[in-house]
Amino acid sequence: MLEPFLEYSCQALLLFFREVSSPAYFLTCPLEYPVFVYGRWRTSSLLGWLLRAKNTFSLEIADFESAGILVADDVTVKPVADQPALLLEHKGERVLVIADLHLGWEVTLAHQGIHVPSQVPRLLDKLRKILAETNPKLLVLLGDVKHAVSKVELEEWKYVPEFFDSLIEIIPDVEVVPGNHDGNLEPLTPSSVKINKSNGMVLWDSVGLFHGHAWPAPPLLGCKFLVMGHLHPVVVFKDPLGFRITRQAWVRAKSDGEKLAAGVLRREDAKFEGDAAVEVKKKFGVSVADADCIIMPSFNDYLGGQPINRNYQEGWTELYKEYMGPVLRSGAVDFENGEAYLFDGTFLGKVQDLRRLAQ
């Protein structure tokens, strides 16, 4: 067992790093609490190590209080502390967003001989607590509400209506942006639940919400923020003895409005030459923006995820790359330079740096 040998108080620190000749170490840094450093580092080498890490990998030191919080046009976008939920605020109006519930996932496990009880009560209880804490006017389910892709499993006729019937008693205003698992979802939902098109919805002319399995609708190209699910991002930590810990994560990355516009135009079968942003403005009346893109973790924490700190050869099969969706595959979102955060606001670093550290 590795024992802590150094206590170091600070606002924030680099959290995960590996030198070529040394094992990986994990540092945690809640505000105004000590940081315990595990391993064989000497006290005198700590600051030098941090400096080398920062210079070698261009890693940034994050302000814990503001980690993951974005503000523009009177709109605030911030993860709910310690939860896989995103809170949007605009002039006193609050909207809560969650993604990837995958209700009925237990049925797939049962077909494989693994029997677990229904997760609907547990997910409802978790969501009820978040709703009580955040008090939103609207709840948006950002795709993959159910698990079966193109059909409705027999058990889903029980699980999904049961979930929604209980949900609308907690919060009456609920909207769904369908994902690739949400075929034939509408018959399972109450009439009061609004089901949007799968290419997304826009809030306050600033926030575009889409699941991520398909190109967003043209109006989303003008948003300052894009929010998507679908990927189920996780990070995998491994200690020197080979034990692995998997943690869900947020990813925040910049989108290239021009590339995104070109992809949407091709999806719309629109012929154009030259500047795609100009064509989008002419065809749809939308001024294309380079948005901040937030990739959400799955709300159902029993699901697996894509290890963003593994390279494609080790952690991502060709099938998983297909599951990334057209936006990420196209390079319209700079995923490699995206910033990864844990649920407590811990800044892990850029995705490409985390992959290099994991090699």
Question: PLM ranges: what are they?
Answer:
Residues 44-359:
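Extended recognition/assembly regions associated with phosphoester-bond processing machinery
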